[in-house]
Amino acid sequence: MNWFLESRAVPQHPQLLPAIAEDPQDVGSNPFLGTTHSPVSTGALTSAAAAPRDVTMHVKLEAVTAPLRASIAAQSGVAIVDHDADLTVHESGQQVQLLGPAGDPIVSTVSSDPKLVQRIAAQAWVNRTLPAGSDALGLRAETDPGSRGNTFVQCESFVFEVRLQKPAYLMLLDLDPQGGLTVLYPTRSSERQVVDAGAAKAIPGSDPKQHILVTAPFGTDQVTVLAFERPQEFLAELNGAERFAVGSGRAEVLARGLAHVSGAVSVQQVNVNTYAGNGKDSCGP
């Protein structure tokens, strides 16, 4: 959506880059246009850099009660800061919001909800677990339809469009608003095959029956897209789109595998915003 540009009164009409699925010449990856994946740490579409990185999760607390402050501060890999935060926790009465670096809402809940702290702890775990990446494989990823600006409503569906400049093996890891983790791809042996360079790849698949259906929990999902130069054996232990928690056996398999990645790896993160539909209890006809 163009509301982001319009709301900021851009003085000159920008030339919007084509979506991956509509860009067979990969114009969007042309460094002349300024779209190379620079080493930034957060945002709707981000890339990990090969340089040393700070994996600490920096959290700012606004009007937070002492018990909640203590619970957040006790999480491994979390540092409480006054500025330059990765996450902000804002408490008002019994309500609390978890916000991203640009003030975008990740989840809104009651202050006694343990899932709030679980979400913070899970993102800190992801920060520590992800390997340092580079642009060696030319990874580019986004949601499709791209006109939605990574924002979808309950019962809508979408896919991730991925393009590579070099052949690679893909993995998508979802962190949902409640702190749950899911390996979205690969979920079966047929998906652990090399993806060719050049052509756009729809993940999980181009068939509408394979598209991702938006359901609860709603908020902001942080989806990490990884491209590996070589096949990674640990992915065979993660069959099925099973939701898991930090500290589970599945999380241990993933952390151990990512700690011993062989070959080049590229990493990008896409934040997907989802909202409940008015009066909808299910996505049935």
Predicted regions and their residues:
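Secretory-pathway glycoprotein ectodomains that are cysteine- and/or Ser/Thr/Pro-rich
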Residues: N2-P285
